[in-house]
Amino acid sequence: MPLGANKVALFGVAGVSTGTAVLLSTATASSSSSLSFTLPTAYKQVTFGFYNITPATDGTTFEFQTSTDGGSSYGMTITSTNFVATHGEDGSNGRIEYVTAGDLAQSTSYQPLGLYVGSDSDESIAGELNLINPSSTTYVKHFYGKFNNYTSSVYTRNPYVAGYVNSTSDVDAINFKMASGNIATGTVKMWGIK
């Protein structure tokens, strides 16, 4: 969901440039164990839009990891931070907090994007993740994202996650999955931004 002059790309079709963003790929989950994308080399930024991603397992975590071998394996070293604003449907427990369960410190685990995602028919997670210069062989790969999810305990959670993949290797694939169970439904779109 690129902002500014790139907004028009939200309505584009794969491979058609509308401004500086190009919609490159769309993946739709249907009881999928994960959704993977091959990352392009021609873009300084890759942006992912997530639309109503619903888990099969109630209260699980939506997460990602990257690869340097075309997706044969996922487990690159990540350091990250994670904080969230939360508010209940009944007006209770409005707060902003750091989420230690959502950060990584030089870990090869999957990076959490949203915790406690609900699996009811009206529950899901939606948002945006930006990966900076994934094909660089000079710099680490910075990422930052913002999401909102309707939790299994009828709260809205608005997580913000940022960090870096601590590698100067070309990152060429990314994988999104739930920590437990399949992705029941939802769509992910990938844009390249020059």
What is each model feature region?
Residues 2-194:
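Surface-exposed molecular-recognition determinants
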